[in-house]
Amino acid sequence: MRKPINLLREFSVPLIAGVITALAWANLDPRGYDALIHQPSFGGVSLHFLVNELFMVLFFGIAAAEITQSCLPGGDLNPPRKAVNPLLATLGGVIGPVLVYLSLNAVIGDPTLTKGWGIPTATDIALAWLVARLVFGAGHPAVSFLLLLAVADDAIGLAIIAVFYPDPVHPTEPMWLFLTVAGIVAAYILRGARAKSYWPYVLVGGGLSWTGLFKAHLHPALALVFIIPFLPHPPRESAHLFEENPRDTSPLARFEHDWKIVVDFGLFLFGLANAGVRFSSVGTATWLVLTALLVGKTAGILTMGSLGKALGFPLPDRVGFKELALTGLVAGMGLTVALFVAGVAFVDPDIEGAAKMGALLSGGVLPVAVALGRILKVRRIP
C-alpha cells in the first residue's frame, strides 16, 4: 500500500489545494488576499516574491535535473533516434499553441495581448501525468510518451521564459550576467574538483547565478537551470522519468531526491500566490489561452507525431491515431509554468488575471479526456 504522503504528491493535491484556496480567498476577500500575497510583510519582501523568485528556483532546478538525467546514455531521451518522435511531438505542442494564439489574436486585433503567446506553450507535467494514468492506465506506453514530451516541453518553456520574457517593468542590465557566468564557471570548477555534495554547486554556483539574473532584471527563478547540468552523475542513467535508483548516490540524484518532496508540497504556496484571480477576470485573454492550449496542443502534437511516424520514426506500441490525439489533449493542461509566464507577460493586472483564468480552465481537460477515452474505447493497461 502506498503511503498517504506519496498519494498526496502523486495526485498533485498540494498544488490543487493551493489553487482552490487562492480562487476562494481572492473572490471572497480580495483585500485580505492581496495584503497577504503582495504586501512586503516578510522582511521587506512579499510572499509573491518569496514564492516566484526563490521557491521556484527549486522547481525549475528539479525540472533541470529530470531533463539532464533523461539526456544521459540510457535515459529516456538518449540515444537521439529513440526520442525523435516525442521531440517532434513536443515541437508541434509548442508551435501549435503559438500559431493558434497569434492567429486568433490577429483576427481580434488586440496588440496588447500579443505578449501572451508563450503562456500556452508548456505542459503541467504532474497534472498531465495524473490525467494520462486515468485515461490510459499506468502501464500504457502513451503515459511514458507523454512524460517524455512534457519534460522536453518544459525545457523549451524554460528557454522561452529566459529569452522572451525579461522584467516587464525594469530594463535588462546585461552586465550583471557576468555573475551568472561566474556561477557556471564555479560549477564547472567544482565538478573538476569532484565535489561530492550538491551544496557547493547550489550555494556558490546557484547563488552567483541568482544574483546575476536578479540584478540583470531577468528571472532569478531560472538560476539553477544553468548549474544543475554540472552536478556529477553516473555515466549511464538506469531509471526512467520520476523513478529513483536507490544505488545512485551521485550529487545529481541526491539533489532531486532531497528537494522533490519540498517542491511537491511547496506547490501549495505557488498555487496560493499565483492563482488568486477573480471570476470576473474572464476576458479575451482567457479564451485565447484556453483555445491555444486545447486546440493548439492537440493539433500540433497529432500533426508532428504523425509526421514523425511517416518519416520512419515510429510511435510507441499501442499508440495509434486516437491515443496520440488524446495525448495531445491531455498535454493541453497548462498550470504551473503557464501561470508563471502569465505573471511575467503582462503588466496590466486585469489582462494577467484573464490569462491566468485561461490556464486554470484548462484543468477541465480531465473529465473530457476520461470521457473521450471511453467513447473511443481506448484500452487501458493497469
UniProtKB/Swiss-Prot annotation:
Compartment(s) of residence: Cell inner membrane
Q: Which UniProt keywords apply?
A: Antiport, Cell inner membrane, Cell membrane, Ion transport, Membrane, Sodium, Sodium transport, Transmembrane, Transmembrane helix, Transport
Query: What does UniProt give as GO cellular component?
Result: plasma membrane
| Keyword Transmembrane among UniProt keywords | yes
Q: Which residues cross the membrane?
A: 5-25, 42-62, 88-108, 116-136, 145-165, 169-189, 261-281, 282-302, 327-347, 353-373
Instruction: Give the GO biological process terms.
Output: regulation of pH
Q: Where is the signal peptide?
A: none
Q: List the membrane topology term(s).
A: Multi-pass membrane protein
Task: Please give the catalytic activity noted in the UniProt record.
Answer: Na(+)(in) + 2 H(+)(out) = Na(+)(out) + 2 H(+)(in)
GO terms for MF = sodium:proton antiporter activity
Coiled-coil stretches, from where to where? none
Which family, according to UniProt?
Belongs to the NhaA Na(+)/H(+) (TC 2.A.33) antiporter family.
Function of the protein? Na(+)/H(+) antiporter that extrudes sodium in exchange for external protons.
Write down what this protein is called.
Answer: Na(+)/H(+) antiporter NhaA
